Design a protein with these regions (language model features):
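Mixed-charge (Asp/Glu-Lys/Arg
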Residues: 1-34, 39-149
């Protein structure tokens, strides 16, 4: 699959499903001109803004994420890096693992997140996927009773 908009749509729907299963209420902004793709509200009413990314698994077992936005218009192709105040988290969907990773929007965002062991079995300074499966703790399970039916 190569169409960028289709990948973005798949990523967004997978993140919405993941957030719902984790007890968040996902909300989509009315305007596509916001620097974030959706808002996640936890069981306490706290809202987090998320920028969704679709990132495929590389052969070496990592997901690389580009923390910038790209667009094209009649003046050419443009690239702009996100700023810290635009949203709270990146929600990165990896289709090969059918997994969503949540990375805090900060200056020290990992550029690569690893799913498989390194070739040299190094573990120091490796950013493992399992450390990015939760979004800011665990909210109350808003839909837990509904899901058990």
């Amino acid at each position: 699959m190569h169409h960028t908009k289709t990948k973005a749509d798949i990523g967004l729907t997978k993140v919405i499903a993941d957030l719902t299963l984790k007890g968040y209420v996902p909300c989509i902004p009315l305007s596509e001109h916001q620097p974030y793709d959706l808002v996640a509200i936890d069981g306490h009413g706290h809202a987090l803004k998320l920028q969704v990314k679709y990132a495929g698994l590389k052969r070496n077992g990592i997901v690389e994420v580009s923390f910038r936005r790209n667009w094209s218009d009649r003046n050419g192709t443009h690239t702009v890096h996100y700023s810290r105040d635009e949203f709270d988290y990146y929600a990165i969907y990896c289709p090969e693992k059918d997994t969503t990773l949540y990375v805090k929007n900060s200056p020290d965002c990992p550029k690569a997140i690893r799913f498989t062991e390194t070739g040299n079995h190094q573990s120091q300074n490796v950013k493992w996927f399992r450390d990015y499966l939760k979004l800011n703790g665990s909210p109350q399970r808003l839909y837990a009773a509904h899901l058990k039916r």
